[in-house]
A protein has these predicted regions:
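The feature captures the beta-strand-to-loop junction immediately N-terminal to the Walker
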Residues: 38-40
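Helix-to-loop junction immediately C-terminal to a conserved catalytic motif
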Residues: 53
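ABC ATPase NBD coupling module
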Residues: 57, 69-89, 115, 127-130, ...
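Conserved ABC ATPase signature
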Residues: 132-136, 140
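ABC ATPase C-loop
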Residues: 149-150
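Walker B catalytic motif
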Residues: 161-162
Length: 235
């Protein structure tokens, strides 16, 4: 993994109307690294992803993406810099087939995966490629949501609660996909409540509480930081 810094979030504040949600988020992500934002519901993790893409209301602070300040850019410009977002609600087009959903996204960078590469990574989608979005299971919809952003050529992937509510066999498959993406030098920000899913995948974990980073835990520090994990996550 390169030590080159790909994303730096500094003193990030974000608002929904009058509600002050993020209170000075600070973290960095290196190129090819997977980091996880861990915390309870309402901690500000999803808002952080949305703020990176400019999908919240007012933002202050700094978001440096591959050396460029993006805090004042509109969402479409940020996406065009190679950012892919997989929201918790997935956003599958119900009236389109699985394959039509895959063909829909615009290109934001070179190197987007071909349909053959997608189907090799997600064999279930090959089998279901002619099925309408409404006929896909929750796990298949989650695979499709991830596959769709891989088609765009994005190199920074913002993944929001991708394991939530899914069968263990699907969660295991998604973990395998993330490992493959790390091998391909994708940079990943993983928002998760499922510590057991995130911990083996993340190079570093940031515990988020009340819209702030409370602690950073490296992959090799999990054992000695058990008390901290218990305090904030109950694990």
């Amino acid at each position: 993994m390169s030590a080159t810094e790909y994303l730096r979030v500094s003193d990030l504040h974000a608002f929904y109307g009058e509600s002050h949600v993020l209170h000075g988020m600070d973290f960095t992500v290196r190129r090819g690294e997977c980091i996880s934002l861990l915390g309870r519901n309402g901690a500000g993790r999803t808002t952080t992803l949305r703020a990176i893409l400019g999908l919240t209301g007012r933002r202050t602070g700094s978001i440096m993406l591959n050396g460029r300040e993006v805090i004042g850019m509109p969402t479409h410009r940020i996406a065009q810099l190679g950012v892919g977002y997989c929201p918790e609600e997935r956003g599958i087009y119900a009236s389109l087939s699985c394959e039509e959903n895959l063909l829909l996204p615009p290109q934001v960078g070179s190197g987007g995966l071909s349909l053959d590469e997608i189907y090799e990574m997600f064999p279930n989608l090959r089998e279901r490629r002619h099925s309408q979005g409404t006929r896909l299971s929750g796990g298949e919809q989650q695979m499709l949501a991830m596959a769709r952003i891989l088609r765009t050529g994005a190199r920074l992937l913002l993944l929001d609660e991708i394991s939530e509510g899914l069968a263990p066999v699907i969660v295991q498959k998604l973990g395998e996909v993330i490992r493959k993406l790390k091998q391909r030098d994708y940079t990943i920000v993983l928002v998760e409540q499922n510590f057991r899913f995130a911990a083996p995948l993340a190079d570093r974990m940031f515990i988020v509480e009340h819209g702030q980073v409370m602690a950073e835990i490296a992959q090799g520090e999990i054992e000695q930081k058990q008390e901290l994990l218990q305090e904030y996550l109950g694990v």
